[in-house]
Amino acid sequence: MKFVDSASVRIEAGKGGAGCLGFRRERYISDGGPDGGDGGDGGHVYFQGQDGLNTLSEFCFKRLFRAKNGQPGSGQNKRGKSAQHLTVEIPLGTKVYDLVTDELIGEMTKHEQTILVAKGGFHGLGNTRFKSSINRAPRETTPGFPGEVREIGLELSVMADIGLLGIPNAGKSSLIRQISSARPKIADYPFTTLHPSLSVVSFCDKHIVMADIPGLIENASKGAGLGFKFLKHLSRAKVLLHVVDILPVDGSDPVKNFLTIEKELKKYDQELANKEKLLVINKIDLLPEKDRNTMVQSLLKDICYKGKVFNISALNGLGCKDLVAGLFKLVLRK
């Protein structure tokens, strides 16, 4: 399914049903009074959050959502049936905007949370409502009121506990395959990850959600590569996991690669750049065992990093169990 993280739709609530103009007509009653009933109310339109959804692609094909109208009233003071409300499901992490006023209507953060987007029209009044001591046979009624019509914008930011960072081919997809049941595409060329993806990591009957985005490259803030436009999907993450390939196949410098990511993060959003991070040094198995500690310490010194570090091999699983345990300990503490 195509990943879509923004959409615009037209929402039309239902119109209220018209009031009835009616008079009592029965045998032996020549001049019955008014008995026109009220109409029914128009249907509201709600958005509802669903945790099984992770894209707005549905709204590429359907852009109009219209609730039904209320039924008109009828004789014998019978009120028209009110219309059922329309509920439209959207992914968690979606912000709902009014495109005309730029008002933020609401934000989906919980499963089955509902947001009222457009109110249905109020019902029309039957002529019985207008009977009075001086007007015993009113012919006045009111039509149903129109429902609200709104142009709505949807902006999705995926909800995850952990956000993955790294240059293309740093090993993020391999890491996801190693510690979760997800099976992202892996290849020896950049940008095998083309859009944000979510995976669930389990440990001791607990679960956390990890988000991966396309790798970042230098000048991403100017539009280079694929990852920059997806950085917003890491904004909700509790912790960022920066994956560094210590022995890149393209011969690039891992120190420069790390600093490039940090620089592009700051250009995008200082608040995101200041999120708590863990450093994962990948492909540690390719280093001679006797030199591993020295090379890792040299890297940490060059990037001036003093936080928590995990040395792993995403290919064969070396160090991944310790990484998962550390992630759960950190996330569950927040």
From Swiss-Prot:
Binding site for GTP: 166-173, 191-195, 212-215, 282-285, 313-315
BP GO annotations: ribosome biogenesis
Domain Obg as annotated: residue spans: 1-159
UniProt function note: An essential GTPase which binds GTP, GDP and possibly (p)ppGpp with moderate affinity, with high nucleotide exchange rates and a fairly low GTP hydrolysis rate. Plays a role in control of the cell cycle, stress response, ribosome biogenesis and in those bacteria that undergo differentiation, in morphogenesis control.
InterPro entries recorded: G_OBG (IPR031167), GTP-bd (IPR006073), GTP-bd_Obg/CgtA (IPR014100), GTP1-OBG_CS (IPR006074), GTP1_OBG_dom (IPR006169), GTP1_OBG_dom_sf (IPR036726), OBG_GTPase (IPR045086), P-loop_NTPase (IPR027417)
Family named by the database record: Belongs to the TRAFAC class OBG-HflX-like GTPase superfamily. OBG GTPase family.
Subunit structure as annotated in this protein's UniProt entry: Monomer.
Organism: Vesicomyosocius okutanii subsp. Calyptogena okutanii (strain HA)
Name under which the protein is recorded: GTPase Obg
Subcellular location(s) of the protein: Cytoplasm
Required co-factors: Mg(2+)
One of the record's GO molecular function terms: magnesium ion binding
Top-rank taxon: Bacteria
Annotated CDD domains: Obg
Entry binding sites for Mg(2+): 173, 193
EC number, as in UniProt: 3.6.5.-
Annotated ranges, domain OBG-type G: 160-332
UniProt cross-references to Pfam families, sorted A to Z: GTP1_OBG, MMR_HSR1
NCBIfam families recorded: Obg_CgtA, PRK12297.1, PRK12299.1
One GO location term (cellular component): cytoplasm
UniProt entry keywords in alphabetical sequence: Cytoplasm, GTP-binding, Hydrolase, Magnesium, Metal-binding, Nucleotide-binding
SUPFAM superfamilies to which the protein is assigned, alphabetical: Obg GTP-binding protein N-terminal domain, P-loop containing nucleoside triphosphate hydrolases
